[in-house]
């Protein structure tokens, strides 16, 4: 998952709760480091990351950037209840930054919202994981019933066919992301599933991004093994599935509550290699970390 260059992990570790968790990449990577992914703890230096500033006194995360939250956990994990109020406060302070929340636990969300939530904060992009049809039918109706101004779906790991046409017609879903499974015991992703899901998004004018094929990819009846994420991303891009739907507009404001002019917002920058990345359509831009391609 490399579609945004900034990640904020206020806590680490998770409890598996559905089929998509079976081969969790976080558990795999922790095991490679001789750690236990089931051990849940609040991060120390990383917890306040969105508030950290550079030597010039400017925020490290610029106005208009988009940050993925809890990519090694779940923001609505029950074990994280003692820390969530503080995390909400950080997002409240950075009303100029978009926070991308993704959960497999939408049933817990309403009880976890801050008291001043109202109809939702405009800088929160709330997404639910729909790894198969069962979870789509379970989680999307809950998503629709929650007070968020921006909503999306992520079919990853994409382990079975998913149809969301009936949900897209409601007009609440602004973006759909899908990607195959990686690392430990990856289950196959079938290109037919991707094409079908993409067509539903095109018909509804909803942005669709196929970020990676996964390790095991089935196309035209042939089974392919793609051993690294860079290759998977390039193949996803090459498939031509990515589609830019209707624009998503976040009304970001400064510390005083005033709208931030468009010219003052962060503009993603990309390198040549980014042009063949499956995630470019929804990416926060290249951070020049040197880790990809």
Annotate each language-model stretch with its function:
Residues 2-124, 133-136, 162-173, 289-293:
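Conserved Radical SAM active-site core
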Residues 3-12, 165-293:
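Auxiliary Fe-S-binding modules of radical SAM enzymes
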Residues 21, 69, 101, 143, ...:
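Conserved, mostly hydrophobic/aromatic
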Residues 73, 105-107, 130-132, 157-159, ...:
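Active-site-proximal loop/turn and secondary-structure-junction residues that shape catalytic pockets
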Residues 83-90, 139-142, 193-197:
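A general structural detector for well-ordered alpha-helical segments in enzyme core domains, enriched
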Residues 92-95, 147, 195, 202:
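Anion (oxyanion) recognition and catalysis
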Residues 99, 124-126, 151, 208:
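Hydrophobic/aromatic residues located in beta-strands of well-ordered beta-sheets
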Residues 128-132, 144-175, 180:
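Histidine/lysine/aspartate-rich catalytic loop segments that bind and position anionic ligands
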